[in-house]
Amino acid sequence: MEQYTANSNSSTEQIVVQAGQIQQQQQGGVTAVQLQTEAQVASASGQQVQTLQVVQGQPLMVQVSGGQLITSTGQPIMVQAVPGGQGQTIMQVPVSGTQGLQQIQLVPPGQIQIQGGQAVQVQGQQGQTQQIIIQQPQTAVTAGQTQTQQQIAVQGQQVAQTAEGQTIVYQPVNADGTILQQGMITIPAASLAGAQIVQTGANTNTTSSGQGTVTVTLPVAGNVVNSGGMVMMVPGAGSVPAIQRIPLPGAEMLEEEPLYVNAKQYHRILKRRQARAKLEAEGKIPKERRKYLHESRHRHAMARKRGEGGRFFSPKEKDSPHMQDPNQADEEAMTQIIRVS
């Protein structure tokens, strides 16, 4: 392994990665430094040392095998390659304002774990490059209290950020090497304020930890979209959406309302419904209504001739010649033609 060293004025950041050449690329104000094989310099301790220089005020991107690491710092970064157990690559990043180092371990399957902070597990296909974005903690003063936030994003995976600055990470993980993929969404409890309903699938497990986060495990893969405080699952290729947020039904959705009535009629209908429900509960009237009240009246109504829209003719309209049924007039005309012929 090789050791890459760069000194900084105030603090020193240490990241353990694999050796490589130094290539700088300018992409949207971010300096990309790729480590590959290059000329080496021997230090006094006998180790091989190389220096990485970065322009002040620009973040540094160090490409690691299988992923990329971005830190928002303008100081030169010290990269040291140290062999880990079982062929692992260990990366240690000190966080300003806190004590200790954040250690990121890259194992061959692609799992990434941050000790003392958030944990991210990445399972990607072979040949695909995963990108890990780690920003320095941003200190925000709210109501006299200092809060430290850190955003971790994985390119190629699914990440969403809430309006409060919290990060929702969707982590697809293979289960026992099978084709079935399960995803885990970590949602801060602060972003779940208000009356909300989370509709999940049959195999969805929802747990709540003591750290103020809610974890939802899904049996499918998809994208997490955060729009206006709403959490949705956008289906990917060949997948079915498993989680969505639906509004709570109001009082008007629980009871069917009659249409096209005024306020007086509406209140009267409600009173009749309450009175009928009370009588049905007491057993005084049957719960099922008959189709018609009197059979004789029903037969008479069915035998009566109706006009347009099912309206009954009045006796005067029925006797008038211009209100005669057109079908009956056609039948009489055909009868006259037959008689003449």
Swiss-Prot record:
The keyword DNA-binding applies. GO terms for biological process: positive regulation of DNA-templated transcription; positive regulation of transcription by RNA polymerase II; regulation of DNA-templated transcription; regulation of transcription by RNA polymerase II; rhythmic process; transcription by RNA polymerase II. Heterotrimeric transcription factor composed of three components, NF-YA, NF-YB and NF-YC. NF-YB and NF-YC must interact and dimerize for NF-YA association and DNA binding. Interacts with SP1; the interaction is inhibited by glycosylation of SP1. Interacts (via N-terminus) with ZHX2 (via homeobox domain). Interacts with ZFX3. Interacts with ZHX1. Residues 290-315 bind DNA. GO terms for cellular component: CCAAT-binding factor complex; nucleoplasm; nucleus; protein-DNA complex; RNA polymerase II transcription regulator complex. Keywords: Activator, Biological rhythms, DNA-binding, Nucleus, Phosphoprotein, Transcription, Transcription regulation. The keyword DNA-binding applies. Pfam families: CBFB_NFYA. This is Nuclear transcription factor Y subunit alpha. GO terms for molecular function: DNA binding; DNA-binding transcription activator activity, RNA polymerase II-specific; DNA-binding transcription factor activity; DNA-binding transcription factor activity, RNA polymerase II-specific; RNA polymerase II cis-regulatory region sequence-specific DNA binding; sequence-specific DNA binding; transcription coregulator binding. Residues 294-304 have a biased composition (Basic residues). InterPro entries: CCAAT-binding_factor_CS, NFYA. Belongs to the NFYA/HAP2 subunit family. PROSITE patterns: NFYA_HAP2_1, NFYA_HAP2_2. The gene is Nfya. It comes from the Eukaryota. Component of the sequence-specific heterotrimeric transcription factor (NF-Y) which specifically recognizes a 5'-CCAAT-3' box motif found in the promoters of its target genes. NF-Y can function as both an activator and a repressor, depending on its interacting cofactors. NF-YA positively regulates the transcription of the core clock component BMAL1. Residues 294-341 are annotated as: Disordered. It comes from Rattus norvegicus (Rat). A motif (Subunit association domain (SAD)) lies at residues 260-283. It is found in: Nucleus.
